[in-house]
């Protein structure tokens, strides 16, 4: 049987399953066949999502553990090459794939939750909202502004109307979205990076440490090596003071930095930082707990109030050898970070900064 005949055969089988799968009576509707499979998948993932989102990233209890382990099981069935096809497919193709794969269904559901929250939420004065979209992609919304860092997502460009600026730590596709970047340019909104230069003398492009002010946000950067040894001066680390109306929230996002303190000094040793940050967002380091190298009071170090360990369940990576860290590994690593309040958030979750603490 040649390839064309095989494809026709498979399509005919799917059509037949779909036709046979519809039955109902006066009182009940039972969905079976292929439609039934999709219905059951959606119901199962929605239940897991609600179970997860009824918990807090700050409390790792049995309910949260159960929900995240279910998501891990979903992710284990999604291969990196399949995810690559999903990312590059036409919209309808990707939507259909998201309906038929559990972790992709959750990926889409989490996206819709964050997008709706960013669009519709009102941020109380003196507070800030911190959303995890996917991988190391965070969106922070304050009473006076909204920005994203390392937003990589199949539908990332839909956030462009709601972001005032975008930060990109480095040129690896699990940390940026070309569609979102272009949408930001089209709206004449700043994109801060060390490699994007849409026009000559673009003020938000730099390969050295910089300071920026955008609205109420004050931003410092430093340039660090990637954790892959050959990539020198490849990652921009961002320190962002979100302003008084955000309750004075400060955060550092490291991207895929290799955590060499000497490269952080332009941020950490600055007078306005003084070796302290409210929220540190590091990646799960593949090289033996080096996250702790930048935690402390010495040169190039900070003492964080909270650590949000990220780069977990990155579906574009094949396995843990390729930095697709499991939730179980993340919990173990979090327990070894030199900050008592270290947590592992999941896609679609929101934390609120209020009265000097995360809620």
Language model segments and positions:
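Active-site-proximal loop/helix segments of hydrolase catalytic cores
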Residues: 153-155, 225-302
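Bacterial N-terminal signal peptides that target proteins for export
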Residues: 2-11
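Binuclear metal-ion centers of metallo-dependent hydrolases, dominated by the metallo-beta-lactamase
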Residues: 31-43, 204-215, 232, 265-266, ...
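C-terminal motif of bacterial Sec signal peptides marking the signal peptidase cleavage site
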Residues: 18-21
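Short internal beta-strands
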Residues: 168, 188-197, 306-311
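Active-site environment of divalent metal-dependent phosphoester hydrolases
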Residues: 155-157, 172-176, 198-200, 212, ...
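Metallo-beta-lactamase
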Residues: 23-132, 139-158, 165, 176-181, 192-248, 336, 344-350, ...
């Amino acid at each position: 049987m040649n390839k064309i005949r095989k494809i026709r055969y498979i399509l005919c089988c799917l059509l037949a399953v779909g036709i046979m799968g519809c039955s109902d009576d006066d009182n009940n509707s039972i969905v079976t066949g292929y439609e039934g499979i999709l219905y059951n998948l959606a119901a199962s993932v929605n239940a897991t999502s609600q179970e997860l989102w009824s918990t807090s990233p700050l409390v790792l209890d049995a309910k949260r553990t159960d929900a995240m382990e279910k998501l891990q099981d979903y992710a284990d069935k999604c291969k990196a090459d399949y995810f690559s096809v999903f990312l590059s497919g036409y919209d309808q193709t990707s939507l259909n794939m998201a309906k038929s794969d559990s972790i992709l269904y959750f990926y889409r559901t989490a996206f819709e939750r964050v997008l709706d929250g960013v669009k519709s939420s009102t941020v109380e004065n003196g507070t800030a909202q911190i959303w995890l979209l996917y991988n190391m992609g965070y969106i922070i919304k304050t009473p006076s502004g909204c920005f994203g860092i390392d937003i990589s997502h199949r539908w990332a460009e839909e956030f462009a109307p709601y972001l005032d600026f975008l930060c990109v730590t480095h040129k690896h596709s699990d940390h940026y979205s070309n569609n979102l970047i272009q949408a930001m340019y089209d709206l004449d909104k700043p994109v801060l990076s060390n490699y994007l230069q849409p026009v000559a003398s673009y003020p938000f492009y730099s390969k050295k440490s910089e300071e920026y002010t955008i609205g109420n946000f004050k931003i410092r950067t430093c340039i660090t090596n990637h954790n892959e040894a050959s990539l020198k001066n490849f990652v921009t680390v961002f320190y962002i003071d979100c302003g008084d109306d955000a309750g004075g929230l400060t955060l550092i996002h490291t991207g895929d930095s290799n955590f060499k303190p000497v490269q952080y000094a332009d941020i950490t040793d600055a007078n306005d930082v003084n070796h302290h940050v409210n929220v540190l967002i590091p990646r799960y380091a593949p090289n033996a707990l080096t996250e702790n190298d930048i935690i402390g009071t010495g040169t190039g170090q900070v003492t964080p109030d909270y650590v949000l360990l990220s780069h977990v369940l990155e579906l574009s990576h094949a396995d843990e050898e390729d930095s697709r860290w499991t939730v179980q590994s993340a919990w173990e690593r979090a327990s070894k970070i030199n900050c008592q309040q270290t947590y592992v958030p999941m896609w679609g979750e929101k934390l609120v900064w209020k009265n000097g603490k995360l809620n």
